């Protein structure tokens, strides 16, 4: 039959131009789209042949084949799927917005749709061929049609398309791309195979290419025998009982490119209003560029086993260490598949998998403390970001936190907040903590002295994230969380009546000298008072309850962030009334020595806190002046 010419439907020429030049930024996608369509056609035949076995035409070895011809400058993708009639060819390939598979899906009702493994909601995927080809030829025959009733479709995307009736022995569709001159590098076995592995490795149907061997000179020799080039089964769609630990670990290494085994995995199938499968992994070790929050991270998104995109933020940033896949047909995709539309379905999936991960981490922490400790050592700091970033899950995340304390014995972060609460002293209703640059600086901080003497455990927070985290985490299990370097510390309930009376007497005795010290240091401190924190050291500095700690001020300065008015607050100087240096100051009559000692007590307290000393040389001279 002679060929018939058609023009594309309204505005299709413009849309084709958009697809070719703007819609897809990555040329590689063309192969993903064609393989996806072939898989779609095979899945449709697989479904329809259940009720009409004759459609298989005694051929149930479903396969997708990719061939290339360097001389002809062509790439051909073929399948033995359902195929198309001439009418379907004109409708589906002549109109951007229509998809035969989408119409097919809409015609299904009830539970049958659950058995149908289709992915055809994209409408324009076929036209991505024109990114790399200046002409496309389609040969197709509908399953069940006579061999002489096949259809040939040809277009250059510029002048409409032609259709003619041809003879085709085998059912299914064959798409031949006539490759553009500037895309001829695609005519390579290894490149095409790598694209299959990257985008379509988990297609349920075998994807085949002719075997390639090399002669003694290294020249490629293409054999007539086909081999399957997609390697990975969609294990996330299988029952957990059907997957071995070895298979789980092999798949993890494939998707993560990690040499080590995963620490744990979470395999989950969700059914109901929202249906999806997920297979999530937590690595053993963090990658070298882990702290780059701008780096792509997250899960590989599949729709019915077809890879859509990688590193899509289906996870909150504080779970960016999680690897794995999400596979769902409920996700809406825009016309290019490149950008997920932000809607309620996506939000629900993100919320659900976040909850699942936190729940599984909680189980791990209770069942296998050694393995959880390994997780915490690798990813604890980034998990802390969630306390501030994810208000709805703040309590769950708080329960997963681990810290060193004054009772834990070393810098290893092993103590949970629940552990701390379980061993609080009788009458204690506050969780005490201190933030510092390092474990040694924290555990030796003078402000711990009274707590150590009274046997009150204090959490030692030494990660840079801790200051920001604690601005949000103000209580746990109904217990207020209190920084011991801020505001007043009320330990009166743990004091004897004699000590309380003694402190009140000292406060009266020092009332005059405290005012004099404050006058000397008036430009440098907010206040001067006697300390309930100190037992051995002469002085320390604190800020008020709502002030920015000296540790935080230091970190902000190091980060190059200046202070708004009122943010960089003056410290409060606290003195130990029983220390001999403070007693000497109290009794000092020489105004110069009095001023020097006042300055020295402030500077050494600032130094211990790691605060910035504006004039280090002046500090050294002052110390040297009084060394005897």
From Swiss-Prot:
Single GO molecular function: unfolded protein binding
Residue pairs linked by disulfide bridges in the UniProt entry: none
Pfam families linked: HATPase_c_3, HSP90
Keyword field: ATP-binding, Chaperone, Cytoplasm, Nucleotide-binding, Stress response
Location of this chain's protein in the cell: Cytoplasm
InterPro entries named among the record's database cross-references: HATPase_C_sf (IPR036890), Heat_shock_protein_90_CS (IPR019805), HSP90_C (IPR037196), Hsp90_fam (IPR001404), Hsp90_N (IPR020575), Ribosomal_Su5_D2-typ_SF (IPR020568)
Region feature C, mapped onto this chain: 555-628
Region annotation B: where it falls in the sequence: 338-554
GO cellular component terms listed in the entry, alphabetical order: cytoplasm
CDD domains: HATPase_Hsp90-like
SUPFAM superfamilies, sorted: ATPase domain of HSP90 chaperone/DNA topoisomerase II/histidine kinase, HSP90 C-terminal domain, Ribosomal protein S5 domain 2-like
Keyword ATP-binding: yes
Cited Gene3D superfamilies: 3.30.230.80, 3.40.50.11260, Heat shock protein 90, C-terminal domain, Histidine kinase-like ATPase, C-terminal domain
Protein family (similarity comment): Belongs to the heat shock protein 90 family.
Record NCBIfam families: PRK05218.1
Description of how the protein assembles with itself and partners: Homodimer.
Function field: Molecular chaperone. Has ATPase activity.
Protein's name according to its UniProt entry: Chaperone protein HtpG
Source organism of this protein record: Francisella philomiragia subsp. philomiragia (strain ATCC 25017 / CCUG 19701 / FSC 153 / O#319-036)
């Amino acid at each position: 039959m002679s060929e018939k010419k058609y023009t594309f439907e309204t505005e299709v020429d413009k849309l084709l131009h958009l697809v070719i030049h703007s819609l897809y930024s990555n040329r590689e996608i063309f192969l993903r789209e064609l393989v996806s369509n072939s898989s779609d056609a095979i899945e449709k035949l697989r479904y329809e042949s259940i009720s009409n076995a004759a459609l298989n035409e005694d051929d149930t070895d479903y396969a997708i084949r990719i061939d290339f011809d360097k001389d002809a400058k062509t790439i051909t993708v073929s399948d033995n799927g359902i195929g198309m009639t001439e009418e379907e060819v004109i409708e589906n390939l002549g109109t951007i917005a229509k998809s035969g598979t989408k119409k097919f899906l809409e015609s299904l009702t009830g539970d049958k749709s659950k058995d149908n493994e289709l992915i055809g909601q994209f409408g324009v995927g076929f036209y991505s061929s024109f990114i790399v080809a200046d002409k496309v030829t389609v040969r197709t025959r509908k399953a069940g049609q006579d061999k002489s009733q096949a259809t040939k479709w040809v277009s250059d995307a510029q002048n409409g398309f032609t259709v003619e009736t041809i003879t085709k022995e085998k059912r299914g569709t064959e798409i031949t791309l006539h490759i553009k001159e500037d895309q001829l590098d695609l005519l390579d076995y290894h490149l095409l195979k790598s694209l299959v592995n990257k985008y379509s490795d988990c297609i349920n149907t075998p994807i085949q290419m002719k075997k390639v061997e090399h002669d003694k000179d290294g020249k490629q020799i293409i054999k007539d025998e086909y081999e399957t080039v997609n390697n990975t089964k969609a294990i996330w769609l299988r029952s957990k009982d059907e997957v071995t630990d070895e298979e789980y670990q092999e798949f993890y290494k494939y998707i993560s490119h990690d040499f080590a085994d995963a620490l744990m995995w979470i395999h989950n199938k969700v059914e109901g209003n929202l249906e999806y499968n997920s297979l999530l992994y937590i690595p053993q070790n963090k990658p070298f560029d882990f702290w780059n929050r701008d780096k792509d991270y997250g899960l590989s998104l599949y729709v019915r086993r077809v890879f859509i995109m990688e590193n899509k933020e289906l996870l909150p940033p504080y779970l960016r260490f999680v690897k794995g896949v999400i596979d769902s047909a409920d996700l809406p995709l825009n016309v290019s598949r490149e950008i997920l539309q932000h809607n309620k379905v996506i939000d629900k999936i993100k919320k659900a998998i976040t909850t699942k991960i936190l729940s599984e981490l909680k189980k791990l922490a209770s069942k296998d403390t050694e393995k959880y400790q390994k997780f915490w050592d690798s990813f604890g700091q980034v998990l802390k970001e969630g306390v501030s970033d994810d208000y709805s899950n703040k309590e769950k995340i708080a329960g997963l936190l681990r810290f060193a304390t004054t009772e834990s014995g070393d810098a290893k972060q092993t103590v949970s907040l629940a552990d701390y609460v379980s061993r609080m002293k009788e009458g204690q209703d506050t969780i005490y903590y201190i933030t510092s640059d390092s474990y040694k600086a924290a555990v030796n901080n003078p402000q711990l002295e009274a707590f150590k003497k009274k046997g009150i455990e204090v959490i030692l927070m030494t990660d840079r994230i801790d200051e920001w985290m604690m601005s949000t985490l103000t209580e746990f299990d109904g217990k207020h969380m209190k920084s011991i370097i801020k505001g007043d510390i009320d330990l009166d309930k743990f004091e004897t009546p004699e000590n309380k009376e003694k402190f009140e007497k000292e406060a009266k005795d020092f009332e005059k000298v405290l005012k004099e010290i404050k006058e000397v240091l008036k430009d440098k401190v907010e206040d001067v008072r006697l300390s309930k924190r100190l037992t051995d050291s002469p002085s320390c500095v604190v800020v008020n309850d709502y002030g920015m700690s000296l540790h935080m001020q230091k970190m902000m300065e190091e980060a190059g962030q200046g202070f708004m008015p009122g943010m960089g607050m003056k410290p409060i100087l606290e003195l130990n009334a029983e220390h001999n240096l403070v007693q000497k100051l109290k009794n000092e009559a020489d105004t110069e020595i009095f001023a020097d000692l006042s300055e020295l007590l402030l500077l050494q307290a600032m130094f211990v806190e790691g605060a910035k000393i504006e004039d280090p040389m002046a500090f050294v001279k002052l110390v040297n002046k009084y060394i005897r």
